[in-house]
Curated annotation (Swiss-Prot):
One of its GO terms (cellular component) is extracellular region. Keywords: Calcium, Disulfide bond, EGF-like domain, Glycoprotein, Metal-binding, Repeat, Secreted, Signal. Changing F503A: Abolishes binding to ROBO3. Abolishes axon repulsive activity. Disulfide bonds join C404-C416, C410-C425, C427-C441, C447-C460, C454-C469, C471-C483, C489-C502, C496-C511, C513-C524, C528-C538, C532-C544, C546-C555, C562-C575, C569-C584, C586-C603, C609-C622, C616-C631, C633-C639. Glycans are attached at N56, N228, N296, N301, N520, T551, N618, N638. It comes from Mus musculus (Mouse). This is Protein kinase C-binding protein NELL2. Residues 1-24 form the signal peptide. Disruption phenotype: Deficient male mice exhibit infertility, impaired binding of sperm to zona pellucida, and impaired sperm migration in female genital tract. Postnatal differentiation of the initial segment (IS) of the caput epididymis is completely abolished in Nell2 deficient males and continued throughout life. Ovch2 is not secreted and Adam3 is not processed into its mature form in cauda epididymal spermatozoa, leading to inability of spermatozoa to pass through the uterotubal junction and to bind to the zona pellucida. GO terms for molecular function: calcium ion binding; identical protein binding. Coiled coil: none annotated. It is found in: Secreted.
């Protein structure tokens, strides 16, 4: 296939994909949100009414004066967000006609104070603003200079494709930018507003029609079918890059696992480990069984598990009977002898005395009682009255003889006890007999059988031959069997926060935060009624610790370092106050040489004559001066003193209003153009209130601060969340603060500050540029793209990142504590 044919097929494929999704704005409802239809606006909706639109195909609505509340219901908003949530390719489409000088919100998606997506048009500053939150949850604002509030119909399209942003106005591509990728991970409770930010702010005034959100690539085609399409989109490309990064991560993890597996295999080749059990010096292998007294035991996973032996009744032949055998738990058949009307077991002896008193000893052998030869008896060292005759021996013993010292059958947990003429077995305390001769005994579980003396507030724990009474949590011991409540508060053995009160309870305690603090008792944080603004921290009840550059009970007041003399800028620079900071900005006629010295020392003169940045006409000669220039008339020549401004000749003494700013006037003074804001004379009844809002005395022109408490007069200005705000005839208009140019490779936005600063260490930079050509080589020699992160091989708490082609690793202290 030729290259030309390939390109044609690819383009055709992209066009088919695009048209199949958007044709007629109704083919695939799952990809679009028809906002006006879903909100069910009508004549009964306060603040809006239906009016003729740009066309008659759909309804158009006039958004009138406040108050109004055009907000999607919870169910409707959630339907919107289900389509939008976690999508990186979507387009906002709207047809509108906004009245002159209105500053209003077209649509807003926000949760609490976090604006996830808000589109705003300012007629005061002639710009379109996009407010959004990135994937790092940081707020961003993109400003597009454009006059949208001109009382004319416009078609607006704002298309997102991952980090690619395109703004079309009336089917013309106005702006195309690479931005931080917006976050569409919308939490529950997020709200959707149309034509306003909330009930009190951002009222759009004008007409809206065809308000749609399309969750698809190149949604602007629905509004302008003839526009060019790009295939693949930025989001497609970003997805491919993301997949490559994921595959790299999988490869790295797989390599690490393989390396660890090889190490383990090498160790396993050197040794063989098997779990065994050792009993009384004998070692048993896994699953091996044995008999231990009256129990059958098995070695399972290195643990001994035993069950009581069940003894079957033996079926003995004639001249035999069941009897215990040494070393065996169960009875076995044993031969018997009949003698003098009684049965004797094999080996059992009995004495018989003759009429003369002579002792004869018999023993059962081969089922017959046979005479045992008398070998004589040892002498006794006790009187005859203390001598005892035995039934199994002709030799007497002294009273107190230790029969247990001879051979006996008492096994583990059984003890031998001496009687007057023999030895018997007896179970130890806490054990019970497993057979009638007490030779074998087992532990009694006093806890399970209720044979313990543990009282309330204790737990019974069985031990070999006994039990223990353990105190329950929150109790302390009185004696071996009882416990009483423990006052953790009194003994300071509680987990309450230092700013909490401890209350003792039965079996425990409760923690309650002190007045002025909030939390669950174990953790209490200071509570400041009015909050701490501008990054301040509440450190005690209604006490804010303000960051550098702010002061006031709530850190609401910016310290003007310039006017209060805290800083001294170079003579070639002016001190510009910023919220929490300041900036030495080069004065007119100077520019920075690229060193960006904080005090303005790097400001140097601009050669207006050499660069053409002057207003001298052709009949004069431009002479450069330090911080300016001079238009000089050649000797002997009569010069007009005219000026050149924006390509047009202005005569000396001429005054004119700027075309793009009706509130500024300029004049030509002997070759120099001087421009300034219009002087506001509030005594003049014809004063332009749009240029001089401070001259508007009407209460209806006052504005309410975003906190809902402070009231401003028309013309007042203030700073709110790194934005400059102004009250203009009842409308609040806010725009991002103008930050000094940061012309360095790496920058960082310090916490609680509004403007970025330069840093030399790329690992300190918090901005990761969208440049996949910059890569890093990790410790496993795997190539990583800029923006990727991973846990360093061989560690658990070392996080590495590839930032702008630089490898940056750091140890997480919290992770180390959790190990």
């Amino acid at each position: 296939m030729h290259a030309m044919e390939s390109r044609v097929l690819l383009r055709t494929f992209c066009v088919i994909l695009g048209l199949g999704a958007v044709w007629g704005l109704g083919v695939d409802p799952s990809l679009q949100i028809d906002v006006l239809t879903e909100l069910e606006l009508g004549e009964s909706t306060d603040g809006v009414r239906q009016v003729p639109g740009l066309h008659n195909g759909t309804k158009a609505f006039l958004f009138q004066e406040s108050p109004r509340s055009i907000k999607a219901s919870t169910a409707t908003a959630e339907r919107f967000f289900q389509k939008l949530r976690n999508k990186h390719e979507f387009t906002i489409l709207v047809t509108l006609k906004q009245i002159h000088l209105n500053s209003g919100v077209i649509l807003s998606i926000h949760h609490l104070d976090h604006r996830y997506l808000e589109l705003e048009s300012s007629g005061h500053r002639n710009e379109i603003r996009l407010h959004y939150r990135s994937g790092t949850h940081r707020p961003h604002t993109e400003v597009f200079p454009y006059i949208l509030a001109d009382a004319k119909w416009h078609k607006l399209s704002l298309a997102f494709s991952a980090s690619h942003l395109i703004l079309h106005i009336d089917c013309n591509k106005i702006y195309e930018r690479v931005v931080e990728m917006p976050s569409t991970d919308l939490p529950l409770g997020t709200t959707f507003w149309l034509g306003q930010r909330n009930n009190a702010h951002g009222y759009f005034k004008g007409i809206m029609q065809d308000v749609h959100v399309l969750v698809m690539p190149q949604g602007f085609i629905a509004q302008c079918p003839d526009l060019n399409r790009t295939c693949p989109t930025c989001n497609d490309f970003h997805g491919l890059v993301q997949k490559i990064m994921e595959l790299q991560d999988i490869l790295s993890k797989t390599s690490a696992k393989l390396s660890r597996a090889e190490q383990r295999m090498n160790r396993l080749d050197q040794c063989y480990c098997e779990r065994t059990c050792t009993v009384k010096g004998t070692t048993y292998r896994e699953s091996e069984s044995w008999t231990d007294g009256c129990k059958n035991c098995t070695c399972l996973n290195g643990t001994i598990q035993c069950e009581t032996l069940v003894c079957p009744a033996p079926d003995c032949p004639p001249k035999s009977a069941p009897a215990y055998v040494d070393g065996k738990c169960c009875k076995e058949c044993k031969s018997t002898c009949q003698f003098q009307g009684r049965s004797y077991f094999e080996g059992e002896r009995n004495t018989v005395y003759s009429s003369s008193g002579m002792c004869v000893l018999y023993e059962c052998k081969d089922q017959t009682m046979k005479l045992v030869e008398n070998i004589g008896c040892p002498p006794l060292d006790c009187p005859e009255s203390h001598q005892i005759a035995l039934s199994h021996s002709c030799c007497k013993v002294c009273k107190g003889y230790d029969f247990c010292s001879e051979k006996h059958t008492c096994m583990e947990n059984s003890v031998c006890r001496n009687l007057n003429d023999r030895a018997v077995c007896s179970c130890r305390d806490g054990f019970r007999a497993l057979r009638e001769d007490n030779a074998y005994c087992e532990d009694i579980d006093e806890c399970a059988e209720g044979r313990h003396y543990c009282r309330e507030n204790t737990m019974c724990v069985n031990t070999p031959g006994s039990f223990m009474c353990i105190c329950k949590t929150g109790y302390i011991r009185i004696d071996d069997y009882s416990c009483t409540e423990h006052d953790e508060c009194l003994t300071n053995q509680h987990n309450c926060d230092e700013n909490a009160l401890c209350f003792n309870t039965v079996g425990g305690h409760n923690c309650v935060c002190k007045p002025g603090y909030t939390g669950n008792g174990t953790t209490c944080k200071a509570f400041c009624k009015d909050g701490c603004r501008n990054g301040g921290a509440c450190i005690a009840a209604n006490v804010c610790a303000c960051p550098q550059g702010f002061t006031g009970p709530s850190c609401e007041t910016d310290i003007d370092e310039c006017s209060e003399g805290f800083v001294q800028c170079d003579s070639r620079a002016n001190c510009i106050n910023l919220p929490g900071w300041y900036h030495c900005e080069c004065r007119d006629g100077y520019h920075d040489n690229g060193m960006f010295a904080p005090g303005g020392e790097s400001c140097e003169d601009i050669d207006e004559c050499g660069t053409g940045r002057h207003s001298c006409t052709n009949d004069t000669i431009c002479f450069n001066l330090d911080g300016g220039y001079d238009c000089r008339c050649p000797h002997g020549k009569n010069c007009t003193g005219d000026c050149v401004h924006e390509g047009k000749v202005k005569h000396t003494g001429q005054i004119w209003v700027l075309e793009n700013d009706r509130c500024s006037v300029c004049s030509c003074q002997t070759g120099f153009v001087m421009c300034r804001r219009m002087v506001c004379d509030c005594e003049n009844p014809t004063v332009d209130l749009s240029c001089c809002p401070e001259c508007d005395p009407r209460l209806s022109s006052q504005c309410l601060h975003q906190n809902g408490e402070t009231v401003y007069n028309s013309g007042d200005t203030w700073v709110q969340d790194c934005r400059q705000c102004r009250c203009l005839q009842g409308e609040v208009d806010c725009w991002p603060l103008a930050c000094p140019e940061v012309e360095c490779e790496f920058s960082v936005l310090p916490e609680n500050e509004c403007c970025p600063r330069c840093v030399t260490d790329p690992c300190q930079a918090d901005t990761i540029r969208n440049d996949i050509t910059k890569t890093c080589l990790d410790e496993m020699n795997v190539v990583r793209f800029t923006g990727s992160s991973w846990i360093k091989h061989g560690t658990e708490c070392t996080l590495c990142q590839c930032k702008n082609g630089h490898l940056c690793c750091s140890v997480d202290p919290q992770c180390l504590q959790e190990l």
